[in-house]
């Protein structure tokens, strides 16, 4: 499947989940706050974390663990026989199976593939290094709650954020700026919040003008999200006119970045500052181009990681 087709497929699946939730997902940082991971123990990031967390909340799953069909077969004592070209039962005592009616969701992975010539020989550069290119693949995974016959408790992720510690506006700002290397200057004043690429400054109203510290943190994280798109940082196209498609996509990146940053700080509730009309206009754009959602979440994952000091 081509990269564009995978992005469209995953983006469309996310929109279906958003329909089931009935709420704008980028205003639900609890979707991002909990740690989902594969059976090998690697935490999911970016689109995979959003996909798994959202689906887990849609279905009410308690487990944060996800398994491929291949891993489930392995736990059920099946091994692939290359000579027979099929799975055979190697451990007859195992009885691990997927519950009836359970559905998988897609996750993605970038693999580095060797470039080869028409004869199947590796292509190298002038120094003799083999040339690689990224290839996007997708896999289906099941939540561990969908599987009977195996105890997954020891594999469950630890340290899920609960949002119990509410900080002051100043503390939230300090927490973000202390981990954001080479961050823009933050200026307080006025009645608007915005990022200026020309001066590399973020302007936000004074803390006392906000309803509560979480609203302040959300607004600041949104504008810091924009700042990560500067040429000397992640180099996104952020010099756009108000209302055009590129501007809209950048706004979506900043919204997701804000939710992810809040979640990484343990904030489980997010201020509802977006109007219904704004959300409706967003959704119509995403329905026509679901791959935009895919790209925005991936970019927001990089942006939130930069702000919070996660490589």
Residue ranges of model-derived segments:
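N-terminal accessory/interface modules of nucleic-acid-binding and processing proteins
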Residues: 1-311
């Amino acid at each position: 499947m081509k990269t564009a087709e995978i992005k469209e497929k995953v983006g469309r699946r996310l929109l279906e989940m958003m329909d089931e939730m009935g709420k704008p997902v980028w205003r639900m940082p609890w979707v991002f706050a909990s740690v989902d991971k594969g059976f090998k123990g690697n935490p999911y990031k970016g689109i995979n974390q959003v996909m798994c967390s959202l689906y887990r909340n849609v279905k009410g799953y308690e487990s944060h663990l996800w398994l491929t069909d291949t891993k489930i077969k392995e736990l059920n004592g099946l091994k692939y026989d290359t000579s027979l070209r099929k799975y055979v039962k190697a451990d007859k005592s195992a009885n691990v199976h997927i519950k009836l009616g359970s559905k998988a969701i897609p996750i993605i992975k970038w693999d580095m593939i060797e470039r080869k010539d028409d004869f199947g020989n590796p292509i190298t550069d002038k120094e003799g290094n083999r040339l690689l290119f990224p290839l996007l693949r997708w896999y289906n995974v099941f939540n561990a709650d969908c599987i009977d016959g195996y105890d997954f408790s020891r594999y469950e992720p630890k340290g899920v954020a609960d949002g119990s510690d509410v900080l002051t506006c100043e503390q939230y700002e300090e927490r973000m700026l202390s981990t954001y290397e080479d961050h823009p200057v933050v200026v307080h004043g006025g009645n608007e919040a915005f990022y200026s690429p020309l001066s590399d400054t973020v302007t936000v109203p004074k803390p006392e003008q906000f309803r509560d510290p979480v609203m302040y943190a959300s607004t600041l994280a949104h504008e810091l999200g924009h700042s990560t798109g500067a040429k000397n940082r992640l180099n996104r196209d952020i010099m756009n006119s108000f209302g055009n498609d590129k501007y809209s996509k950048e706004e979506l990146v900043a919204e997701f970045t804000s939710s992810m940053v809040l979640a990484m700080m343990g904030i489980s509730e997010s201020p509802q500052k977006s109007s219904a009309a704004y959300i409706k206009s967003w959704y119509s754009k995403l329905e026509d181009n679901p791959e935009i959602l895919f790209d925005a979440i991936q970019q927001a994952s990089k942006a939130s990681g930069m702000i919070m000091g996660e490589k």
